[in-house]
């Protein structure tokens, strides 16, 4: 396919500069590696792609936009999902949302706690509500995954063994995210998930305990409520005209101001004229779920898979 692309889309390829041909060749190798890894993952899974570039809202959206109403204000969120994988089981379609990332984007519960990094969750929970009209089955949210789509560069010893190199590559390319912790679902996602997971963001102890990026069905249900609550809060703030300069801050290298396109117009100065940094604290998983339970009025209740 790449040879056909070169023939049809890049006339005079052989006359291009050596730098162009080198960079294109490197990009080609990276793309082929990504496709190979994706094929390897799907070969070990009962989850199969059911949609690509699935749109929410807009003129070409397959599903409606995510809409929140607050008084006379309406918030409409549209976008696209890179890929949706599904597993049909007992008359229900388990769906996971997959997003390709060329950088080192990670799924961080601390971000979600403060209303950041919730895009994939928005799509997942919208699929839960609206997906039956598209796919024909009741939808069960099964998780969100960031799929590495980048050139892999490792720092290793020169004489590293092929086996050790493979393990290092697997660690680097493991998916990041959150998945439904039901053992049957995990095994459907990756056949060896309960023994030696290679792709999923989970760890399995010697006694079979599962940890890492997992959540119960009850936790995902509460998380969906919390995300919707966040959207209502955002809508109210927009309706009230809130334009406070209070950027998120975790440190000098992790500030919303670092790469802000509007810095020259904002002139933010912490502590001056009402400007203030909004420090974000790291939260552990148990702290996060306790907070979500409190915010959704579910404290003291316990759900099963």
Q: How should each PLM-predicted stretch be described?
A:
Residues 1-305:
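Structural signature of nuclease core domains in nucleic-acid processing machines
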